[in-house]
Amino acid sequence: MIGKNDPNVIAILDWELSTLGDPCADFNYHCLQYTMNPKLADKAYCKNQGIPVIDDYVKMYTEKINVDLTEEWDLYSAYNLFKLAGILQGILGRVRDGTAAHENAAERASGVRNLSDKAWDLVKKNFL
């Protein structure tokens, strides 16, 4: 959290999942919502909601930072899909142990295999 009248960090929420690193990797992680939410693949839905489609959104970001992410995008995507799959696997572990905080945790975390497969497909397609 940033202070109300001070641009300094005053608190960190969910420290367990915090990372400091490549801002382009962070942006790609943020863009996983387009992969995870089928509605965001629908251009008409996005337009109606005032949400840019993924290609336009990435273009806006890359133009703002003056960096071309074309070659790195699939690498960032594979990394972040594996990262999210790992997080979901941790949730499934808490479900198994009876310590999951949310009643729908098992359902929410059920995409581990799908995310891992998507990540591995990107690796095989681009890097092997």
Predicted regions and their residues:
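Conserved NTP-binding catalytic cores of kinases and kinase-like/nucleotidyltransferase enzymes
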Residues: 3-10, 40, 65-69, 105, ...
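Regulatory N- and C-terminal appendages and interdomain linkers associated
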Residues: 94-128
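Short amphipathic alpha-helical segments and their helix-coil junctions
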Residues: 9-12, 53-69, 114-115, 119
